[in-house]
Structures are given as C-alpha cells and as structure tokens.
UniProtKB/Swiss-Prot annotation:
Protein name in the entry: Canavanine gamma-lyase
The species this protein was found in: Pseudomonas canavaninivorans
Matching PANTHER family: CYSTATHIONINE GAMMA-LYASE, TRANS-SULFURATION ENZYME FAMILY MEMBER
Family of this protein: Belongs to the trans-sulfuration enzymes family.
High-level lineage: Bacteria, Pseudomonadati, Pseudomonadota, Gammaproteobacteria, Pseudomonadales
Assigned GO CC terms: cytoplasm
Length: 400
C-alpha cells in the first residue's frame, strides 16, 4: 500500500505522528493546524435540522472544539482504534470510563497497585457515595483474578506497568478473563504509549493515557484520552464529557498535538537511555534495589519481553539507595541534573522520593519498597552518560 496522509492506516508510526489529525488552514494556507480559540461555532441556517444530542459536529467548545477533534483523530490512529475522546486531565479520562459504564450495585476488579487517584475512587468515593463495590487484586495472579469475579463484575481495571512499582500486567490474559465473564476491561497505558505498545491490539475495551506525560512529552500541557470503538467513545462523550464539562482547552489540545509529533523519536531515546541507567544502578552496591522491567531480576521480565515484543521496557524505574528515608532525601538533594518533582514522561528527568505515609495500597508494595521507601525515576532526554555521572556524584556525596 502506498503511504498517503489522507489514509492514516497506510502510515508508519513516525509518519503518522507528524501528519495524523493535521488539517491545513483553508483561510491562511498555514500547513499546520492553527489554534482555534472560540467558544462557539456557526450553526446551520436552520438549526432545527441539527441533532443536538449528537457528539459529532462543532457547536460549543465544551462539547468539542476543532483542536480537540484533530487531536482525537491522531490519538485514535496512533493506537490503531476507531475513535478517541480527550479530556482536561488523565484522571478525568479515567473517571469518564467509570462514570459511563458503572452503576450502583456493580462490582469492579482493580489492580492492588494502582495510581492513587484510582485507588481512592474505588476504595472510598465510588463505594461510599454510589454503591459500586471494588476488589483490589494482584492482577499478576490470574487465578486470584478469576476467583474475585462475581456475577455483578462489570469491569476489570489495571495499568500496563504499575505506578510506581513497575509491576507488569499480562494484558492479553486479563482481557480474556474479562470477556469470558462478560465484563469490560480498561487499561491505563500511560507508561507504555504507542508505538512502543498498543494495548488495543490485546483486545481491551478502553485504553486510557494521561496525555500530560509521554504523549505531550514537554511538561507544559495537561490532558487525558480514552481510546476505543466508536460506539463506546460516543457513549463516553454523551455521558461524561458534554454534561460534566471536563473538556480540554483548545490551547492544551494544540500543545499536545504539537508535542506528540516527536513521540516516536523521543521514545527511541528514552527506552535506550533507561536500559543503560537501570543496568548502571543495578551494578552499584550502594543501591538497595532497582525495579525496571528490562532487568533480568525484575519479577515480570519475561512477561515484559514477550508483551512488548522486544521494543523496550519503558522509561520508568523505581529504586532506593541503602539507608533510611533521610538517606533518600539527601541523595535527591545532591543531584544536579535530575529534577526533584512529581509527574513523568517529560523531556527532563524527574525523580520523587515516595514514602509510605498516607499511600493507599502501600502494604501490597514489594518488601524492599516498604523497608527503604522508594525513588520513582522518570528518565528524560538528557545524554544517559550525563545522567549516570549525576547519579554517581550524588551517591559519592551522600555516602562520603
């Protein structure tokens, strides 16, 4: 098939990242999609002919705007799915799935190691306020997942690579379990963006990304997306976007559209650098432990190798230096290139010391995490040798 930007399915990932969703401006002739800052769009001469309940069409930016539509087309194509809907944040995207497809009396199986906002939703808010029950399960133990199923189980939710422990879930196996039971499966794939991994190819119903992270990749815009079939996405648009209003701003949609152009190139650098840095950390006897799926010592290394088809193992890792929480803090304060800040997937490397205090599900973390605490490390685009030198110097300063 001849590659043609009018036929997105004909394009490789790198080409798609450049051309997907891009619409040249008919008025100015600009070859890139312009930023459209408008609350409202022109109605037809006879508004009575409109389907006001349709999620399609440009009417009011809370429903959808031009930049939002362009970004959705690109993200759906990158994931290899029919449709996408973007939101103001990744948490809003996650909530949209739960709000649209769960009701009082339903039961959900959730990974016992999960993002804190999801943990609180299913441990506190949804059960207490809406009567939605949740069971937190080690999704790496497929028999435990099967045993947790109930007649009213409506959804299984997991992350591909768990935040922050880097535990890897077998997405294909979990999808089979969910669908055999007549349940849906939603997957947070923020740590594993396309083209590195396409969770949709495992048959999941909903792929969720925090666009704030790798897909934007520059630490300057927030957003989230749910990707799936047209029917499922239309329901989310109708139920959880138009009348709840967590709509992405045109500016952030435009920024993420721009940032995503370099996604495949950035991933190549990030995956390569992360592997080198993980091996370095693993070799230093001042390091208490390193959890990175690319290391042979990682509990799910073989699963990661098979599931990610040799493309890499992500750019997130967790480790700790030998010592107590104060030792972790001193090490972080001695870094000169790596930035101490929350978030991940940015152009710059980010590290955060995460303690046990107040974290839901911490008792399910590996023993080393509970003993030492842990440092969540998001590898950035800097030269890996510079990052290794920074870590070495910080270790020397910490243990002198």
């Amino acid at each position: 098939m001849r590659p043609d930007k009018k036929n997105l399915s004909s394009l490789s990932a790198a080409t798609l990242a450049v051309h997907g969703g891009n619409v040249a401006d008919a008025t100015s002739g600009a070859v890139r999609t312009p930023l459209v800052m408008a609350n409202s769009y022109l109605l037809p001469e006879d508004p009575a002919t409109m389907d006001w309940s349709s999620p399609d069409g440009l009417v009011y930016t809370r429903n959808q705007g031009h930049n939002q539509v362009c970004l959705e087309k690109k993200l759906a194509a990158l994931e290899g799915c029919e449709a996408a809907v973007v939101f103001a944040t990744g948490v809003a995207a996650l909530h949209s799935v739960f709000f649209s497809f769960l009701k009082s009396g339903d039961h959900v199986i959730v990974s016992d190691i999960t993002y804190q906002a999801v943990w609180r939703l299913f441990a506190e808010l949804l059960p207490e306020r809406y009567g939605i029950e949740a069971t937190f399960v080690d999704v790496g133990d497929l028999d435990s997942v099967r045993q947790a199923l109930r007649p009213n189980t409506r959804l299984i939710h997991t992350e591909v690579i768990a935040n922050p422990t880097t535990k890897v879930a077998d997405i294909g196996a979990l999808t089979e379990i969910a669908h055999a039971h007549g349940a849906l499966i939603s997957v947070d794939a923020t740590f594993t963006p396309p083209p590195f991994f396409r969770a949709s190819q495992q048959g999941v119903d909903f792929v969720v990304h925090s666009l704030t992270k790798y897909i934007n990749g520059h630490g300057d815009a927030m957003g989230g997306v749910v990707i799936g079939t047209q029917r499922m996405i239309d329901k989310i648009k109708n139920d959880a976007l138009v009348d709840l209003g967590a709509t992405i701003s045109p500016f952030n949609a435009w920024m993420i559209m721009r940032g995503s152009v370099t996604l495949p190139l950035r991933l190549n650098q990030l995956l390569s650098s992360a592997g080198k840095i993980a091996e370095f950390l693993d070799s230093d006897d001042r390091i208490a432990y390193v959890y990175y799926p690319g290391l042979a010592s990682h509990p799910q290394h073989e699963l990661a190798r098979r599931q990610f088809a040799g493309k890499g193992y992500g750019a997130m890792m967790a480790f700790a230096v030998k010592g107590d929480p104060d030792t972790q803090n001193r090490f972080v304060s001695n870094l000169r290139i790596i930035t101490s800040a929350v978030s991940l997937g940015h152009d710059e490397s980010l590290i955060v010391h995460v303690g046990a205090e107040g974290r839901g599900g911490f008792d399910k973390y590996p023993e080393e995490f509970r003993q030492y605490g842990h440092l969540r490390f998001s590898v950035g685009l800097e030269d890996p040798e510079d990052l290794i030198s920074d870590i070495t110097a910080a270790l020397d300063e910490t243990f002198k």
